[in-house]
Amino acid sequence: MCALSREADAVLLLFDEFWDEAGDPYGRVKSDTNFYITGRIGKHNVVLTIMSGMGTNSATYAAVNLRASYTGLQLILLVGICGGLPRIGDKDAYLGDVVVSKQVVGYDNMLDDGTGRPNADVRPLLAALDTEFMEKRLKMAAAIHLKELQQEAKEQMRRAEYHYPGAKNDAIYPPEYSHKHKDLCRACAENPDFFCRSAFQSSCAEIGCEPDKLIPREHREDLPKGADFAPEIFIGRLGSGNTVMKSGLDRDRIAAKYNVVAFEMEGAGIGEEFPCIVVKGICDYADSHKNKIWQNFAAATAASVAKAILAWFPSSSDGQYEPPPKGMTWYSLFSKY
């Protein structure tokens, strides 16, 4: 499900074939207003659906319609971008790394009641992916798919840039250090928890965020822009809500209380009755310093991990990769932040 085109564009670069180049051959039920793109990724027939908007309500509506039109649906992958914690468990997390949902909980009205458990059909796969052995395999496969995506984007002369933005653009401030004008702005000065629209639309350099306030971190490698980057993959509990997380203090408070590793906006809208795995690339640190520099690259790393996951999901295909008849088994790729 894509509320932003950038997530869908990244996913579509990893389609191996399209079944709908001459128009939609499968149709949809009368009440379904979703838009679909169908094709093949690896050994699976896939359908990508684009949401009408952001948030859990839009996700619920799109998922229900999808299930009605594609009754043979076996797996939903909710693929896109998210805000992540700078440290997950005992590891530093960096922009471009990918999180995979072990559980999804709504942080707008979060209750630790066990909700958000993955569907029973995907629990064995998630348990396998959580092993060190499969994690290494997944990471290696995702790195290959990322290079394929970048090459395909180049060949198609895509406007979007999917290469690594560079370690120097991966910076983080303390959670209490807000992204706001440091002087000459009454709105930013009057409320410590508020910053003006102009600040929100400006870069850290433009509004005077002080470089000496940055948290010093050792990157895995001091990679320049455009370098090869193999994303780390974290499997854990994701927070999901209808509002964008953009406070370092709120991020850390909620993460500590509910043991979440990242924040996104659609996963909680897809109920336990749907076989769903959320795969999101970290494009910011869920604080007030968020920007769009990493969004395309994070969408690309998430799409690459999603394709790697699909390779280990059982297929009902007989090995003949042709446009399937209506009623065939389908796998859905959703993407959004």
Features from the language model and the residues they span:
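Intrinsic-disorder/coil detector with helix-boundary
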Residues: M1-F334
